[in-house]
């Protein structure tokens, strides 16, 4: 099994900043946990891939959450990532699938919808948050992340995302790239890169052919123009815990907790991101009430 990872690079003497990722295993983990059907797998996988690369732009303990809500049948897509390559995600309606579109591809646009917003919240530490959003312009997601960067962060970018799904619903290939134009970039560089992106083979096909993140960027930017900086391993990782959900239950207040004791003699919580279930005994709930009244 090939390791998922992101590569960071500069190109054309610093005119271009670039990221590329192979995320096949992480998207497979999400597919397995949520039992997503193919169109939902593609939508979730594309969102997770973009989010992972955006996470790789962060530093230290910073993290970010991306929410895509196009008011389509799939509902909301939520993914979050950190600077260390940990990624997780879920969709409201994982069992969403449609016939292939006119191009013979998974109809992600129909599932996502085109009437809504893409929102990014960055947790940059010390309880400091940056939030930006942009309208969904395509529903195919690559174009929507491209538009987000142009309008919300004022960084001209090209975002390519792809997921191929096998007939048995497993993930055949997943990955993508983010190419960003730095301030004062030369016009001829921008023209070259735009042309290369316009002519390239779909990213999911390149990953399926076995191309690494480095080879993806070489394909777009040309071997002689790219300087690779570092790689970040990517994995599906959820940081939920018994303790975190216990604190969340505590936040519901005494009346709500008492109702759980009276009606169910305990409680169960399920994590949206990884589907882990946590059981809480009547004694634990009574302990929370005691803490609230201490």
Curated annotation (Swiss-Prot):
Instruction: Output the InterPro entries linked to this UniProt entry.
Output: Heat_shock_Hsp33 (IPR000397), Heat_shock_Hsp33_C (IPR016154), Heat_shock_Hsp33_N (IPR016153)
What's any GO biological process attached to this entry? protein refolding
> Is Transmembrane found in the keyword set?
no
List the CDD domains hit by this protein, alphabetically: Hsp33
A Gene Ontology CC term for this entry?
cytoplasm
Task: Tell me the disulfide pairings in this chain.
Answer: 238-240, 271-274
Q: How is it modified after translation?
A: Under oxidizing conditions two disulfide bonds are formed involving the reactive cysteines. Under reducing conditions zinc is bound to the reactive cysteines and the protein is inactive.
Q: One GO molecular-function annotation for this sequence? A: unfolded protein binding
Q: Where in the cell is it found?
A: Cytoplasm
The record's keywords, sorted A to Z, are: Chaperone, Cytoplasm, Disulfide bond, Redox-active center, Zinc
Function text: Redox regulated molecular chaperone. Protects both thermally unfolding and oxidatively damaged proteins from irreversible aggregation. Plays an important role in the bacterial defense system toward oxidative stress.
Family in the record: Belongs to the HSP33 family.
Annotated protein name in UniProt: 33 kDa chaperonin
Organism of this sequence: Staphylococcus carnosus (strain TM300)
């Amino acid at each position: 099994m090939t390791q998922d990872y992101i590569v960071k690079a500069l190109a054309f003497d610093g005119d271009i900043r670039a990221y590329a990722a192979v995320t096949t295993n992480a998207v497979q983990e999400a597919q397995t946990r949520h039992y997503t059907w193919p169109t939902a797998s593609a939508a979730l996988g594309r969102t997770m891939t973009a989010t992972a690369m955006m996470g790789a732009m962060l530093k230290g303990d910073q993290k970010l959450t991306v929410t895509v809500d196009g008011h389509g049948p799939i509902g909301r897509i939520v993914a979050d990532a950190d600077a260390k390559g940990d990624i997780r995600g879920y969709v409201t309606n994982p069992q969403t699938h449609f016939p292939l579109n006119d191009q013979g591809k998974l109809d992600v646009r129909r599932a996502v919808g085109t009437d809504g917003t893409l929102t990014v919240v960055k947790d940059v530490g010390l309880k400091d948050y940056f939030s930006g959003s942009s309208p969904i312009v395509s529903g195919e997601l690559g174009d929507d992340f491209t538009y987000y960067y142009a309008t919300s962060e004022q960084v001209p970018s090209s975002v390519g995302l792809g997921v191929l799904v096998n007939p048995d619903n497993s993930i055949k290939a997943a990955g993508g790239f983010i190419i960003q134009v730095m301030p004062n970039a030369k016009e001829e560089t921008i023209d070259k890169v735009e042309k290369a992106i316009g002519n390239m083979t779909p990213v999911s096909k390149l990953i399926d052919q076995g191309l690494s993140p480095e080879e993806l960027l070489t394909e777009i930017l040309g071997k002689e123009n790219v300087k690779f900086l570092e790689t970040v391993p990517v994995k599906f990782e959820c940081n939920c815990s018994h303790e975190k959900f216990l604190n969340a239950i505590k936040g519901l207040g005494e009346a709500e907790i008492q109702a759980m004791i009276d009606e169910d003699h305990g409680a169960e919580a399920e994590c949206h991101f990884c589907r882990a279930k946590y059981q809480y005994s009547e004694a634990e709930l009574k302990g929370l009430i005691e803490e609230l009244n201490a």
